From Swiss-Prot:
Keyword set, alphabetical order: Cell inner membrane, Cell membrane, Membrane, Transmembrane, Transmembrane helix
Any one GO CC term of the record: plasma membrane
Subcellular localization, as worded in the UniProt entry: Cell inner membrane
Keyword Plastid assigned: no
Organism phylogeny: Bacteria, Pseudomonadati, Pseudomonadota, Gammaproteobacteria, Pasteurellales
Protein name: UPF0283 membrane protein HI_0043
Record-stated family: Belongs to the UPF0283 family.
Amino acid sequence: MEKQIFEHSVNVEEEHYQPKQEFHNMEAKLDEALDGELLDAQLEQALKPKSSFRKTLLKFTALLFGLATVAQSVQWIWDSYQKHQWIYLAFALVSLIIILLGIKEIICEWRRLVRLKKREQWQQQSQQIWLESAVKNGDVFSVHNAEKSKILCLDIAKSLGLENDSPTVIQWQHQLNEAYSAQEIAHLFSRHVLSSFDAQAKKLISKMAAESAVIVAISPLAVVDMFFIAWRNLRLMNKIAEIYGIELGYFPRIRLLRMVLVNIAFAGATEVAQDIGMDWLSQDVTAKLSTRIAQGIGVGLLTARLGVKAMELCRPLAFQLNEKPKLSHIQQELLSSVKDIVLGKNKIYKKEQI
């Protein structure tokens, strides 16, 4: 048998390389931000504290005016007492009491605003914790960061009215381990302690969004709807703030109201809601009623969005990407509520006509 020699041939595909490209005097064009991303950026920009010389001068002027008013009232009381002008003395005492009550209210408003700013600082610290977890820094598993995260969580629990012997806090502490990082400690706190507060806020948002949608859908007066929805949105913000342990005064409420004004500038929400609503509306509903239903859905979605934004702002720990509440479950409940009430009412009306 003759020896056969096989030659090993390697088929190498020729690789075609593109020649290098050189760009001279070219302008780079950035991608346009989406509507939701642009709205979030505007929200964050509107909520950032702005320090300026004018504000400092205004505060200093208000302080001098308050001190001068108190001094003038005391001088008025003393002069009236020396001259035995008892009527003027009574007016001076009443004026001083009113001024002191006003100063007390201003101090309380300032303390509430300080608490709200403290809540914002906690959110920034938690965002830094999530950011360190995302980039996988070398200091992520340091003992110092873990202790800071634990202290932060305990301070948040105290602000929510939860003591160290609270069942949820005890359950969270039992889950802790010395090997856990700062991110894991904060995540466990969010899951065991803050989850109940989140559930209350989500339930409240779904309820008030559905109620607003139904009321707008069946109400014939647009002016009444406008003021009613504005009042309900403010009430929704107040209730969400109460759930997360924030006492809103005048200035903190103004600060949260900025978020409402930014979110009111939504683009095309009513038109999108109308397209969604027309999918399930039956053909026997009149065009006018269909428009009212679509408007109700749009208002309900707007209320839900405002509630979610207020929830993100009032929550002491910033949401992780997988924890952020979505409008999908609220949208389903919204559609079913409006459909059942409005279309049910329409069927009853037709039966009465028959």
